[in-house]
Each structure stands twice: as structure tokens, then as C-alpha cells.
Amino acid sequence: MSKNLTTRSEDYSKWYNELVVKADLAENSGVRGCMVIKPYGYAIWEKMQAELDRMFKETGHQNAYFPLFVPKSMFEAEEKNAEGFAKECAVVTHYRLKNDEDRPGKLMVDPNAKLEEELIVRPTSEAIIWSTYKGWVQSYRDLPLLINQWANVVRWEMRTRLFLRTAEFLWQEGHTAHATKDEAIEESEKMMNVYADFAENFMAIPVVKGFKTETERFAGADETYCIEALMQDGKALQAGTSHFLGQNFAKAFDVKFANAEGKQEHVWGTSWGVSTRLMGALIMTHSDDQGLVLPPNLAPIQVVIVPIHKTDEQLAQITAAVNELTAKLRKLKISVKYDDRTTQKPGFKFAEWELKGVPVRIAVGPKDLENGTFEVARRDNLSKEVVAAEKIVDHVNDLLEQIQKDLFDKALTYRNTHITEVNNFEEFKEVLEGKGGFISAHWDGTAATEEKIKDLTKATIRCIPLDAVEEAGTCVFTGEPSSKRVLFAKAY
């Protein structure tokens, strides 16, 4: 097959867009700003879901489901949250259509079917969930309340890109209620760490843990914790957020509990989420000019086996050997695909599975059967080797672990060599437009400076790293005193 992929150095954005479509991950739909996630792309998302869901349950959370629609009066109860999302909301105003008498066979909105109160299509679910929690929480015995929801949300984006920014996207959102401030802060930090663990151990993406500035904070939160990743083009991508909500939503929706002394108090809240944006992060962190590169821990197919034969008799002999190998690999929980299609030649299959990022490819022909060997190819570095049949199972198992580690190490090296300390604004601009990546710089702590830097350079403060050390310095832009460095970058 012909890939005809634009290279990353030619046009990184075009390379990404082409890869998503050609690797059969997703495509644009007939609805502006919305995507169709195709089976192969959805299989990767399912792997992500499965691991995250396990991690949530291991930390005591349960899944539930809440309505897609939120009455406008309920949505606006927490003012900062409503104001923050207002411009992105899709709004339902009518509840039915009718036949259009002036245009036979066509429909129109029935003007007599106007809703008494508009319904907001959820951009996030704090309002509907906290209004429900009011009925669930009465006593300290009902706490903590640890709930997660897998859902779709709608944010009316004008400039969309597959996986990275779409009007409708899939995500999970956790919403928890606690008896004390300390418990809620601990939960917020715990879930940030869960996300970081998932990103590093499953996605093979190193992340910086930190918290957002007040300007970048989630609308309605007292603090937003985040994990930030760096893509191959030197732009950052926010890979997960966890919000300490204080008592803001509890007060807006009057969620109170009787403490051990019988006194009424408002609960403390958190919310946290990751979305199908993670698919974009996965693609952009590891993939190359040949196509997708998937870390084994999230690859729907970890090993593909391609037979090389000229006769049906040869194919039958190869298939017998492959069936034996496949059974042994599957016992080790390794996902295997035997591509015995007779409609395509081996070269086409090699190119197709390379494009789709399958971590390990095994080729076997009549000579391999004679010699008791298999040809094994790695997708990440495109290397090949011949492995004895008696060693193949252990070799493949070890190889998958090695590829997972190597992908993380490669991404970590790139990330670490693209964190640059700067001490003046000229240097800041030079690094931003040249090398790119994270820029570690002093900031005076004001929203005005943050906004001016963004206007002039398009760079935002990605986070204040949790491990940032106290260091006296002067703001890179204003020269005012600063106590620590923050990370700036251009971002998706």
C-alpha cells in the first residue's frame, strides 16, 4: 500500500491530520466539528478506558451516569462556572419538529413547542451532579462520595481538529464530595497522580505535574492541578486536570451534611477528567513519518504475524506453526493478529501494519519453517532480527516490555532536552520561535503580565511545577521580583 504521508518536518499539522485518517483512527463527520471515531481508533480508546476505569475503582470510585441536559437555571447556579462555559454551550430551545407546509417533505421547528426553560447540553457536569448530591448527602456517614462518569460532552468549538479539539468529545469526569478541606485537596492530588501514572506507564508519555495559574484555572475551582506533556513539535498538551473546588458548588447547590457533633456544614468538592484528547497526545508523542507508533500497553494488536508463501500447501504448513505460536502468546495475555488474507501481498500487509503502529511484526515463510526461525520486526525503531522458534515466545514478551520502556525513555529525553531556562524576554522569544518546548522563566505573578506575554508570543503558562524550588529572581517580562520559575509553552 502507498502511505503518501506528509513528513513531520514538511508540515507537522498536515502530517497529524493525514495520519489520523490514513491509520483508520477517525474522520470528520457530516456534523460540523464532530468526528467519527473508527473501530481501530475506538479500540485504543477502549484500552485507555479499561486501564483508567481499573485505576479509579482501585482508588475507591464508582461509576454512575447523569443526564445530558441541564436546565439553564441549574447551570447558572455556580456563577464562575456558568460564565466560564457560557460561550461554548449548545442550547435546546424546542422539543419537537413538524411538517413544513410550504416545503413538502421537509421539516421545521414547531414554534408552539418552545420549552418553558432552555436546556444546556452539558459542557461539563458539575451543575447536574451537585444538584443531585444535595439529595444524597445528609450525614458525615454519607461521605466521602466518590463518583465517576464516562460520557460525552459538547463544547461549541469553531476551530476543530480530530481528537484534539472537537465540538463533541468523549471523556470521564470524576466528582467527589468530602467532609474536610484536607480530604478534598488530598483527593485532587491523588487523581492528578493517577493520571500521571497512566500517562507514564501506559501511554509512555512523561508529564510535568503542576497547578494552573488563576487565569488558566477551571471556572469554579479554587485550585487546578494538571499534567502537561510535550509533543514532538515542541508544543505542550494538557493531558489531564484535577480540580479542588473548595465549597463553591456545595454552597451553590446547598449540599450540607451533619458532622459528628450534629452541626450542619457544607461539603468540600473535587472534579477531575481526561478525554479523547489523550488520543491526540499518544499519536503526536510517538509516531513517525512511516505512520502510527503505539506503546504495547495500549496497542489493540500487539503482535501481527504475516505468512509468506507461494502455494496453498505452504500456507497450510505456516498456519499450523502460527496457530501453535499464537496460542502460546495469548496465554501470556499478548494480543495477536494473524493476517492470512490472500487478497493482499506481504509487502502491502507490512506497510499497512506499520502505518497502524502495531509494536511487533513476525514474518514466517517456508525457509523459516525449515530453519526453525521467525523474522521479528520492531515498529518503534524499524529493526529486524531472526529468532529461533524455541525462544520466540519469551523473546516477544521481553521485546514488548523493552519497546514500552524505550518509547518512554525516548520521549523523556526529548522532553528533558526541551526544557530551557531563560532570564530575559529576548531570549524567551528566541527559544520559543526556534527550539520550542517548555520555557522555564520567572513571572511576577500577575494576570496582566501573563496576558501580555500570551498576546505577544502565543505562549501561555502551562503550569507552576509542583517541584518548583524557591528561587529569587526577576520576571522575564516586567523585571519585577519573582520567587520561582514557571513553565511557558505554545500549546494545543
UniProtKB/Swiss-Prot annotation:
GO cellular component entries = aminoacyl-tRNA synthetase multienzyme complex; cytoplasm
What is known about what this protein does? Catalyzes the attachment of proline to tRNA(Pro) in a two-step reaction: proline is first activated by ATP to form Pro-AMP and then transferred to the acceptor end of tRNA(Pro).
* One Pfam family hit: tRNA-synt_2b
Q: What's the protein here called?
A: Proline--tRNA ligase
Asked if the record carries the keyword Cytoplasm, the reply is: yes
Quick check: keyword Chloroplast in the entry?
Answer: no
**Which UniProt keywords are given for this protein, alphabetically ordered?**
Aminoacyl-tRNA synthetase, ATP-binding, Cytoplasm, Ligase, Nucleotide-binding, Protein biosynthesis
HAMAP family to which the protein is assigned, alphabetical:
Pro_tRNA_synth_type3
The protein's annotated catalytic reaction(s) are: tRNA(Pro) + L-proline + ATP = L-prolyl-tRNA(Pro) + AMP + diphosphate
Tell me a GO biological process for this protein: prolyl-tRNA aminoacylation
Quaternary structure note: Homodimer.
Q: Indicate the family of this protein.
A: Belongs to the class-II aminoacyl-tRNA synthetase family. ProS type 3 subfamily.
Q: What is known of its domains?
A: Consists of three domains: the N-terminal catalytic domain, the anticodon-binding domain and the C-terminal extension.
Q: Where in the cell is it found?
A: Cytoplasm
The enzyme's first-digit EC class, named in words, is: ligase
GO MF entries: ATP binding; proline-tRNA ligase activity
| NCBIfam families the record matches | proS_fam_I
Which Gene3D superfamilies does the entry mention? Anticodon-binding domain, Bira Bifunctional Protein, Domain 2, C-terminal domain of ProRS
Q: Which gene encodes it?
A: proS
According to its UniProt record, the EC number is 6.1.1.15
